[in-house]
Amino acid sequence: MTTMTNSLISNSVSSVPESLFSSASIHRPVAINPAMLAQFSINLPVLPFESSASLGTSTTSSSRCSSTESSAAPGKIRRGRPQQEIADGQDAHSQKKRHRRLYARQYRAQMRQKVENVKSLHDEKEQLELEVKALRQAVSGLQQENAQKDFLISILQLNNQINHS
């Protein structure tokens, strides 16, 4: 057991540079590579792509494909600005400016809509807070009324018990 441990330690120490051992007064942690201590080789079978389809996965349009296939896909999702064709008499820079103006208008419209939504939501929140306050006052009033009725009922029951005894 000790010879095996010593050989494992010597193998792992042999992978450590000698410069770490030259300064004996400084104790540094030594990195041990676990792959050097015990090497495992696991051979996993490689399944062809079609065999996974027979296991129950679908091979419809949601199946994975390589980047060359996805770039040629007809229903490809495009991101970013829509690219318009440049006519012969048009300048590419003027088209870019047109795109920027278009998206700036859309962005400003979206921001205006968000601001309007925030204002309406703020007003609605204030209205709901007022309703909650009114409902809480109504609940406290009903609780007081209920407590008064309970008090009267308990007094009447006590009077009734006193009269019967």
UniProtKB/Swiss-Prot annotation:
Superkingdom of the source species:
Eukaryota
Where mainly located? nucleus
Gene field:
zip-10
Known function: Transcription factor that regulates the expression of genes in response to changes in temperature. In particular, binds to the promoter region of genes such as asp-17 in response to severe cold to warm temperature transitions to promote gene expression. Promotes stress-induced death, particularly in older animals, following cold shock followed by warming and this may have evolved as a form of kin survival under thermal stress conditions, favoring the survival of younger animals.
Q: What happens when the gene is disrupted?
A: RNAi-mediated knockdown reduces the lifespan extension phenotype of the mir-60 loss of function mutant.
Protein name, entry field: Transcription factor zip-10
Residues annotated as region Disordered?
Answer: 53-99
Organism classification, top ranks? Answer: Eukaryota, Metazoa, Ecdysozoa, Nematoda, Chromadorea
Disulfide pattern: none
